[in-house]
Amino acid sequence: MHTRPPCILLVAIALTITALSASAVGAPVQDPLHLQSIDDLWTLSTDQLALDSAQFKTQVLNSVPDLVPADVKCNKIKRCDQKGVCAIVCQHGSVQVDRWLQRALKLQRKLAYRRNFCSATLPGTHNSAINLADGYGVEDHVFEGYLHYFSWFKTGMKVHTNDQLFSLTDQLHMGVRFIELDVHWFDGDLHIAHCGGFKSKLLDGMIDVFNEIAKMLGTGIEWDSETIGCKPSLSSIPSKEQRPLKEALSELSTWLHAPEHADEFLMVFFDDETDLMKWKKVGKLLDYIKEYFPEKEILRPFELVFDTKWPAFEELMRVGKRVVFMSGVDYLTQGEEILFVKDNVCNWQEPPLPLAPFPECRFNHSKANIGVPDENFTIFRPETSEIEYGFLNADGQIGTNENLLDEESLPGVADCGVNVPSPDNITPKRMEATIWAVSKGHELDGNKCVALMRESTTWQSVDCHTPNLLPACVDVHNPRHWVLGRSPVVEADAAAACAALSSGTMEFSVPASGYENELVYTQLMQHAPSSISGVWLSAKTFVSEVYSAEVEQDGAPGIGVATIDDVLSVE
């Protein structure tokens, strides 16, 4: 690639940014850097650069940062790229998940599988395969070091280009059931790549300056943004090291086909590009899918009758369907053999946060002010990104990432029954925030009955003859219509009490989402006499299945957990 002299390059970029800001309509560019001029964005501390070349290589380039969160336990290994840049990451399949959390997630998943695509609540992740365990983001600390040579650098600015910390296997082990794969064609194959989905001259300019700094320092670590089909790359990983799609599909297949996961369903979404059809690569995508997943277990578009409701997940699994594949692009007849078009599935929506708390549960910043209570059973998949490029956010704009799916927002999202919340940087702690049925650290008793008591929205194990409890009854035609029985009964009589209600369409049941659980709790607190202490839930069978069985090991079978002092390998 032809390289322009640094001074000419910086002037050219400054002129581009000045023109960009001058032509913008509406509010001026936000400037948290308090620059005197937009040109100052690209001013470098050149004297410092000249002094720091040797020191940079010692303190930054050759450093091996530990990128495993402090509260995560796993097998730590040293992951290096082909240039010798390394970081400490978690080995595939070794992230520990507490037993209570594994069981709580499995319980909620069993309940969710009773609902269909349009109403089930199952955790997802954003850009699932752009993860640190597979090398995405390993070079970030080098580019973060380059930031120090910008005149406006402030302590705390980061370069963070991986969406996830852990492998696909670990995400699945943590309860994720919606996987997003960013698929692009370059270097003669389909790869997992975070390619330019938006146009940001600010990001393009920063990448160019990063590469000029690399030349001045003599590090040889430049941002690969020139790959055909992937320009710019939004990750610091070299294009030739971005993972082949086949490897990701193989990993998903290995997990799904393990005997202990025979009762699980997986949703896979390809965030792909229309060029795959133009380049005649859709057939290759389908061939890769069929190589790792038997066609008989794939739910395919022609197998559904669209004028009827979507089947429940448990119904699909009973007939051997275990996985569904969706695409962000309509490939017409080329893709319809296997791929559902995302936008045609349950009026799919990806609204931005914030989300108003229960009972409103509306995405107030969405254009249509949509929300869970609309009862049109739309799939809501909010996704948020925590990628950072110094002073640029995940959208390549000046500013920070706001309204994130994290430990603070996810409990409210769970209470509203949002279908597929898909955050960045999923961890066991972040998954804890999605639990609505069981209190932290608590395990239910598989030999007892289950009730929702006044003192908490989480469930309790109680004696099956506990007095002063009403049955929770749901409309068989509408899982969001809940009422309570007329009078207290023992648990064994709850089904008859619901069937005796005047409507004739009510049955004794159990909430399948945080939203349904909140509806039942609201009935208890607002409509039941004060003498009623709680509500029977038809959950004994599910609780018995989950809490009477052994859960998976905290890490992958056969993998012990050790500190980096004990295990230091290169993957």
What is the predicted role of each segment?
Residues 26-178, 185-269, 273-276, 280-284, ...:
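Long, acidic (Asp/Glu-rich), low-complexity accessory segments flanking structured domains
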Residues 319, 329-571:
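Extracellular, disulfide-bonded carbohydrate-recognition/adhesion ectodomains
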Residues 55, 247, 251, 284, ...:
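Acidic, Ser/Thr-rich intrinsically disordered and amphipathic helical segments
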Residues 173, 257-258, 290, 294, ...:
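Sec-exported extracytoplasmic/periplasmic mature domains
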Residues 6-26:
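Cleavable N-terminal signal peptides of Sec/SRP-targeted secreted and luminal proteins
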Residues 3, 105-107, 309-312, 456-460, ...:
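Eukaryotic intrinsically disordered and solvent-exposed regulatory patches
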Residues 305:
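SF2 helicase/translocase NTPase motor core
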